[in-house]
Each structure stands twice: as C-alpha cells, then as structure tokens.
Amino acid sequence: MANRSTETSEAAIRRFAQLVRTGEVEDYSGELRLGIDLGTANIVASVVDADDRPVAGGWVHSTVVRDGIVVDWLGATTAVRNLTQDLEARLGYEFTAASASIPPGVGGATATIFRNVVEAANLDLTELVDEPVAAARVLGMTDGAVIDIGHGTTGVSVLDHGTVVLSVDEPTGGHHMTLVLAGNHGIGYDEAEALKKDPASQRLVQGVIRPTLERMATIAATAL
C-alpha cells in the first residue's frame, strides 16, 4: 500500500465511511481489490483501486464472531458471499480474491478458520493481516502502536519499521460496555446498545462504563 499523509488517510477513511453508509460507488478503471473484516458486531467489505482509493463498501450486522473467534462458520461464509455478490452487482465487477483481517495475536487454528471462511465464499485469500496492522497501513504508519477497540476485543499492535514486534488481543470491547449498561439500568441488550450510541446520553453512559474503559486502557498500557 502506498504511504499516505495523515490528511489524505483521514479523507480516505471519511470517504469510505460515506460509501458504506450510502451504498454509493466511485467511478473506477483497472483492477479492484477486495478486503474483508470479520468483526464481532459487523462484517465489513471494502473495495479499493490500484491507488488505494476507496471505490465501494458494504457491511452487515452479524453475530458470527465472538471475542475474535468464529462461532458460526456457515453464517460467516454466507455473509461474506452475500456482501461480495452485492458489491459485484453494484460495480459490474467480478472478484476472485480478497484479503482479510484477523484479531491480533490469534492462534493458528483461528487464523485457519478465517482463511476457510473467505475461501468457502469462492475467493482466493491473498493476505491475512492483523486488524491493527491493517489500520496502520491505511494511516501510512511504519513505526508506533495501533490500538484497535472493537465490539468484542481490544487489540494492540506495535510496529518497528513496518514489522510487527508485538501483537495482543483481549476480550473487552463495545459489547462489554453494552452488557454493563444493561445490568446497571435493568434493561435489555438492544435498548442498552441504543442508549450507548445516543449522543444525548453521553454523560450518563460515561459514568457507568468507566470501569470498562479503564480495563481497555489497562490492556493497552500493559501491552506497551
């Protein structure tokens, strides 16, 4: 991936978010590349051109991954296949391969399952990369640390001249915030999730989830 300035990286991220949200596609020419992120809350597919310019994206809410582990292989495969087919229809382009991101520090068995999911969706896997490392590439980082707070886990990767020298992943994320809110207020999970995302409730929510946030900070501090 070509190096980007911080401003260019942030613009690309904002544009990709808009493409995912609206379903729009950019004009393109030449070869396109597909990336798959199997997350705890969502499965996201991204498409870029040869210059790493965002062209399209898609997502689906999913519960097939839990704390970085695939718990529903068939559901994960179906979701990846459906996302790919939707992008192909919108772009008029056929994908035969994809790269995928995995939680940092996972064992070989988990990595193999992620690989099998992509390949079962009729895609050749070109690369399997740690999620924080994928983020570092987008940001053009070669040295430093990336902290990835997901729905199910908090991951930390440390890079030295582009090489990963440390990678950890611990089961504390947005999902755990929601559980704490649900228990504190005596409400269901879905209602707690909506409360967590409501900007008007930010002050109320922050006090309740503070211990979870501190746990995430401890994970990062211990890794670093």
State what each model feature region is:
Residues 1-40, 44-149, 161-170, 174-224:
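Nucleotide/phosphate-binding catalytic cleft detector across ATP-hydrolyzing
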Residues 155-157:
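A structural feature that tracks compact, well-ordered secondary-structure segments
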